[in-house]
Amino acid sequence: MAYQDALSIRELAQQHNALFGDSVALIASENVMSPLAREVMISDLESRYAEGLPHHRYYQGNNFVDLIEDKTNELLSKLFKTEQTDPRPISGTNANSAAIYALAKPGDLVAVPALSGGGHISAAEFGILGMRGVRTISYPYDKNTMTVDPDEASKIIKREKPKVCLFGQSVFMFPVPLKEMKGAFDEVGCKVWYDGAHVLGLIAGRKFQDPLREGADIVTGSTHKTFPGPQHGVILGNTDSETWKSVRRAVFPGVLSNHHLNAMAALGITAAEELEFGEKYASDIIDNAKALAGELYSLGFKVLAEERGFTESHTMAVDVTQNGGGKYVAETLEASGIILNKNLLPWDDNKKSQNPSGIRIGVQEVTRTGMGKSEMKEIASLIYRAIVKKEEPSKIKEEVKDLKSSFRHVKYCYGDVDAYEYIKLI
């Protein structure tokens, strides 16, 4: 019976792979790994432990782990042009946990992006910052672009004198105007922390902004969104040695013990691939995002930030109030084979999280599997037919499956593999 239970779980995992293999995946926080990265994820590294820093471990048997971590740090350093790299966090939120423990104490004031303006839940009072016991204050922002207003934010920074200024969003369409706020940072003497989880691959590809050269002391991020690696995290720095030591101590022994060695190795492989393919990949992501946003707008959808070209990242936000609301649209599209998520927009109360006004769309995964501008036009048409024309979801789903059949292989990497193939070992 237990064996049959195990097989039933495997069957569900196979069905999950098939679902995404036949769907257009537009979740802005997901991606698919390269063949080399996937391969190392099922290596013996998955079973092992390594506490501390390379060559100063608390466990034996880490000789090759140390070399892998050294190489990963070397590649990250080259990719992001900094000597301060830490590939140990096991997720973006784990990296954020280390950052807040290193940079602030309970009672300190931290300036953050508003949740209604696309801010991440880890910066909310019910997230990591709240659990750390810090006080928060939100930046004013442009409600149409969901971007911090640098002039008004500078006034607040100078007046309130936060210990830390945190930037970065989960609806991250435009670069943060860090340079415009540098005078306020310098006057107050705060640490500047940039959560680049969503745009890390665009930063690596030199197509978004360079936060470490624009005023950020610390950059945290997950490594599985526009940076197309494993579910893992990273911290980068351009700060003084004492602050960096505090960050590393916060990582271990502060917020983790073992750092998931297989994922760290996959991160290193992805960094190597980004050095070769990342610039083209980032450029194509942004081109596709602009194309899809423009097509949706031309079909009558209320895409935010029209006056700025809709987006400069992988993400766009769409107000679908007139189309039934975010919950209805997301569920209808899922039934039609198009997977994205409902999302709060600036004019929504947080209590509307179960049925907000908007949807969030990201194109990094469909770009990763080879889709281009012509496919963006086709996807926009499918969304229009499902939501506006209310065509039968099963009919749309078959067309989505047919479209996806030509775009299942991972690009911008070494090797060629079906991104959604289920790999059996027995």
Curated annotation (Swiss-Prot):
It is found in: Cytoplasm. Keywords: Amino-acid biosynthesis, Cytoplasm, One-carbon metabolism, Pyridoxal phosphate, Transferase. The modification N6-(pyridoxal phosphate)lysine is found at residue 225. Homodimer. Transmembrane segments: none annotated. One of its GO terms (molecular function) is pyridoxal phosphate binding. InterPro entries: PyrdxlP-dep_Trfase, PyrdxlP-dep_Trfase_major, PyrdxlP-dep_Trfase_small, Ser_HO-MeTrfase, Ser_HO-MeTrfase-like, Ser_HO-MeTrfase_PLP_BS, SHMT-like_dom. It comes from Thermoplasma volcanium (strain ATCC 51530 / DSM 4299 / JCM 9571 / NBRC 15438 / GSS1). Its cofactor is pyridoxal 5'-phosphate. CDD domains: SHMT. The keyword Signal does not apply. GO terms for biological process: glycine biosynthetic process from serine; tetrahydrofolate interconversion. This is Serine hydroxymethyltransferase. NCBIfam families: PRK00011.1 (NF000586). The gene is glyA.
